[in-house]
Amino acid sequence: MLKHINFQATEYVIVTGGNGRIKKQGYGLDFFYNNASTSIKVIPSIAFDTSYMFNDIITHDFQNISVQGDISYVIDDFEAASEKTDFSFINPEDYAEKLSEAQSKMSKRIIGIVKTEIAQFMAAKDIRAAIQSQNELAAKLNESMKHHTYVREFGLSVINV
């Protein structure tokens, strides 16, 4: 059955045919398609924000501290992101739920990486140094997250931590 679909300018669309080859891709596409032989992935190009709070970070002198913050990130490699996260588009009604699930998975991945980076950083500090190292930690997280292999592998780019 032939259908028509129009996507927003903030949505990157990848359309594949029955042979698995990409037929078209780009921002805000508008096209007719056969839903029996066409696969569509819709990846948002907007920035995402997520918060974290860890209560189980241990310092060098075995003191427990809490660390919290926010992370902003975008998808900058749409094909890599679509391979690692399900962005398949079936109909407009289910897309919002699918996008919410995808964002949740991406946020969990990034938060896991952030927790590892923070734990390693704080493990080298005593409690006094840890409490006073807020700016140093932020700078280290910004630098390490922007170049982290796993973040790049998922097609993501961290804007700010």
Task: Describe the predicted segments one by one.
Residues 6, 13, 47-161:
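Amphipathic, interface-forming alpha-helical segments with heptad-repeat character
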